UniProtKB/Swiss-Prot annotation:
UniProt note: phenotype after gene disruption: Disruption of fadD23 increases binding affinity to human macrophage-like cell THP-1 and shows a lack of sulfolipid 1 production as compared to wild-type.
Protein name per Swiss-Prot or TrEMBL: Long-chain-fatty-acid--AMP ligase FadD23
UniProt organism field: Mycobacterium tuberculosis (strain ATCC 25618 / H37Rv)
Membrane topology classification: Multi-pass membrane protein
Cystine pairs: none
Keyword Lipid biosynthesis: no
Pfam family, one: AMP-dom_DIP2-like
Catalytic activity: holo-[(hydroxy)phthioceranic acid synthase] + hexadecanoate + ATP = hexadecanoyl-[(hydroxy)phthioceranic acid synthase] + AMP + diphosphate; holo-[(hydroxy)phthioceranic acid synthase] + octadecanoate + ATP = octadecanoyl-[(hydroxy)phthioceranic acid synthase] + AMP + diphosphate; dodecanoate + ATP + H(+) = dodecanoyl-AMP + diphosphate; hexadecanoate + ATP + H(+) = hexadecanoyl-AMP + diphosphate
Length: 584
């Protein structure tokens, strides 16, 4: 029996479309207009086998191969070559400096790679990052672009059934103690079946023949890896790719690449929709028709309904269809995907009383009032339940609890972390409802609720702000702030004299134009909005320059680090109001 795996499905693509274009990478670093380089399926396969042959010289089946390379075709070939060799791939970012490199160091210590795959351009930066303490042998480092990648195939095909883990997807949480989620081919293929059923429900769960993937997401992030590298192989379609830097430099490039001939399927976090709506100008979009875009998935972080509306309103004149925007929920522990909005319909937004939410209950309110949340149909696969984490019993509709997930897409656990694996992946329900399995359940650590047979997400339980005894979602408070400032912000609770006080860190653009009057205006507007919408007073509003708020490698705010920086008075304030010791 032929096992289904990424390498075996790559072979199928070669058999069906040997000369078809597989991956096209647009390099905007060498030329601002973009230099395009493409590989056919045959070329991808040949290069993958040659990388695998080199990898097998240094490591055995089941060993770890870390990929530390810039975004590009070499990264894809390195990742696929590691899989083809039967190793466990560990995708990481190229060394960037700062907290990013701390994370790389921690992952290397945890994964203990037997070989490192990189490129010649950054070899000098990579070697110090993977050099172990004295007395421990360094893993060999291979520059894949220096191999004779297009030589006659010289690698044997590995029996995929021998592999229990395909790759380790390290989470973007703690920098110093990262956890590697063990993803199997069974997880990947199950998750793709779930995604295809949901995203193409309006076309009989069959992707259109002219579908292509467009992604600028980093390959070391779960959504970027699954969408940019795995999806083209599993779906059997081409991909047009570029880098996160290319997007950040000119967000309009994202729209331009999606408007190519064919039906684009893309994805991005919420901030990308906000940035594109604000920065893309009509001159960049002249002549573009966005009407053929099949799907733009919005996930990886809390989805703000107001951001999606701004995005659609901004680009509807270029024929962007509202139902092409698909809010989504997922996490690395479930491979990547759990739920999305209804196919063929605009995102459905419901409104709830903020004070009831802070008390643990979901009470609907009039449209346009209260807290706006995206509505998701409860998926049949995977199974989702809202659970009281203290009693392990299912919550009734309208009661906030922890989101638990059960399905073949849920990973087996964390690499060499049995205790954390049991806590996170070993959930068992007490007296489950009819048709609901006892376990095992993935405890996501996210809070949510069910209302009128729809599923709603609030945010990370560990990030909940407890102010004067009531729970408040930092995501909701940050959404309120961003409606005024349009920039990154962080809502944190800081202990002070036995209670926790709300502090907001707010990044403001156009530093040169930030006079006292504007700073005062922003302060008044933000504090008033938080008071009106959430019934909270802001103990301190910290105005800072862009880039001041620490984030993870996937762009999420590191709130615990924000608390630390605030308490140590390490934010450089634009309002020149340093924290006093007496304030704590």
């Amino acid at each position: 029996m032929v096992s289904l795996s990424i390498p075996s499905m790559l072979r199928q693509c070669v058999n069906l479309h040997p000369d078809g274009t597989a991956f096209t990478y647009i390099d905007y670093e060498r030329d601002s207009e973009g230099i395009s380089e493409s590989l056919t399926w045959s070329q991808v396969y040949r290069r993958t086998l040659n990388v695998a042959a080199e990898v097998r010289r240094h490591a055995a089946i089941g060993d770890r191969a870390v990929i530390l390379a810039p975004q590009g075709l070499d990264y894809i070939v390195a990742f696929l070559g590691a899989l083809q060799a039967g190793l466990i791939a560990v995708p990481l970012s190229a060394p960037l400096g700062g907290a990013s490199d701390e994370r790389v160091d921690a992952v290397v210590r945890d994964a203990k790679p037997n070989v490192v795959l990189t490129t010649s351009a950054i070899m000098g930066d990579v070697v110090p990052r993977v050099t172990p303490p004295p007395g421990i042998a360094s893993p060999p480092t291979v520059a894949v672009d220096q191999l004779d990648l297009d030589s006659p195939i010289r690698s044997n095909i590995v029996d995929d059934s021998l592999q229990t883990t395909a790759y380790l997807q390290y989470t973007s949480g703690s920098t110093r103690t990262p956890a590697g989620v063990m993803i199997t081919y069974k997880n990947i293929l199950a998750n793709f079946q779930q995604m295809i059923s949901a995203y193409f429900a309006d076309t009989g769960a069959v992707p259109p023949l002219d579908l292509f993937i467009m992604s600028w997401l980093p390959f070391y992030h779960d959504m970027g890896l699954v969408l940019g590298v795995c999806a083209p192989i599993i779906v059997g379609c081409g991909a047009v790719l570029t880098s996160p830097v290319a997007f950040l430099q000119r967000p309009a490039r994202w729209l331009q690449l999606m408007a190519r001939e064919g039906q684009a399927f893309s994805a991005a976090p919420n901030f990308a929709f906000e940035l594109t709506a604000a920065k893309a100008i009509d001159d960049d979009l002249a002549g573009l028709d966005l009407g053929r875009i099949k799907t733009i998935l919005c996930g990886s972080e809390r989805v703000h309904p107001a951001t999606l509306k701004r995005f659609v309103d901004r680009f509807s004149r270029f024929n962007l269809r509202e139902f092409a925007i698909r809010p989504a929920y997922g996490l690395a522990e479930a491979t990547v995907y759990v739920a999305t909005s209804q196919a063929g319909q605009p995102p459905e937004i419901r409104y709830f009383e903020p004070h009831e939410l802070s008390a643990g209950q979901a009470k609907p309110c009039a449209t346009g009032a209260g807290t706006a949340l995206v509505s998701y149909p409860l998926p049949q696969s995977p199974i989702v339940r809202i659970v009281d984490p203290n009693t392990n019993t299912e919550c009734p509709p309208g009661t906030i609890g922890e989101i638990w997930v059960h399905g073949d897409n849920v990973a087996g656990g964390y690499w060499e972390k049995p205790d954390e694996t049991e806590r996170t992946f070993g959930g068992a329900l007490v007296a489950p409802s009819a048709g609901t399995p006892v376990g095992p359940w993935l405890r996501t650590g996210d809070s949510g609720f069910v209302s009128e047979d729809k599923f709603f997400i609030i945010g990370r339980i560990k990030d909940l702000l407890i102010v004067y005894g009531r729970n408040h979602s930092p995501d909701d408070i940050e959404a309120t702030i961003q409606e005024i400032t349009r920039g990154r912000c962080a809502a944190i609770a800081v202990p002070s004299n036995g209670v926790e006080k709300l502090v907001a860190i707010v990044e403001l653009n156009n530093r040169g134009n930030l006079d006292t009057e504007r700073l005062s205006f922003v302060t008044r507007e933000v504090t008033s909005a938080i008071s009106t919408s959430h019934g909270l007073s802001v103990s301190d509003l910290v105005l800072v320059a862009p880039g001041s708020i620490p984030i993870t490698t996937s762009g999420k705010v590191r709130r615990a680090e924000c608390v630390k920086l605030y308490r140590h008075n390490e934010f450089t304030r634009l309002d020149a109001k340093p924290l006093q010791a007496s304030d704590l």
